Amino acid sequence: MKIIDIIKSPKPTLSFEVFPPKTSQNFESVRMAVEEIAALKPDFMSVTYGAGGGTSDFTADIAAGIQDKHGVPTLAHMTCVSSPRELVRRVTDTLKDKGITNVLALRGDIPEGFDLSTADYRYASELIREIKERGDFCIGGACYPEAHPEYC
């Protein structure tokens, strides 16, 4: 189910966010947390994404597991600022292959010492365009209504 359809519902929406572990050794703690959260019957669960795609495979695996085992729709986060184009395409294709149709597209924090002028993606809007070209995704984004803090 697409998140936009859930949010359009007149009833209040309940969602939870989980963070993938940094290593596969900590998967059990995430699995146990997901079990407890899923029992609360949330409308959806979001799964965050490590900076630079460091836990991107974990994001896709956890999101797919939540949907497959618990029937809870998921929203996979993606960041782009320090991710090469090929990584973004691979992650997007993996999400699609695993049946994840909801993505929260974020620029992400600029890593210390990173030269933004060398980035394949400088803005989340560029990531959104890339995701749209790769499948029928429901894409959300974040914004700063008054201006991004970097420009204030």
Region spans (language model):
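Glycine-rich, proline-tolerant flexible connector loops at the mouths of alpha/beta enzymes
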Residues: 21-24, 42-62, 109-119
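Conserved anion-binding
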Residues: 102-152
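Distinct, well-ordered alpha-helical segments
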Residues: 26-34, 59-60, 91-92, 149-152
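Active-site mouth loops of central-metabolism enzymes
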Residues: 13-29, 74-86, 138-152
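Conserved N-terminal beta1-alpha1 strand-loop-helix module at the mouth
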Residues: 1-47
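Glycine-rich anion/phosphate-binding loops
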Residues: 80-94, 121-122
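Alpha-helix-loop-beta-strand connector modules within alpha/beta enzyme cores
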Residues: 53-77, 120-141
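Short, well-ordered coil/turn segments that N-cap beta-strands
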Residues: 9-13, 41-44, 70-74, 99-101, ...
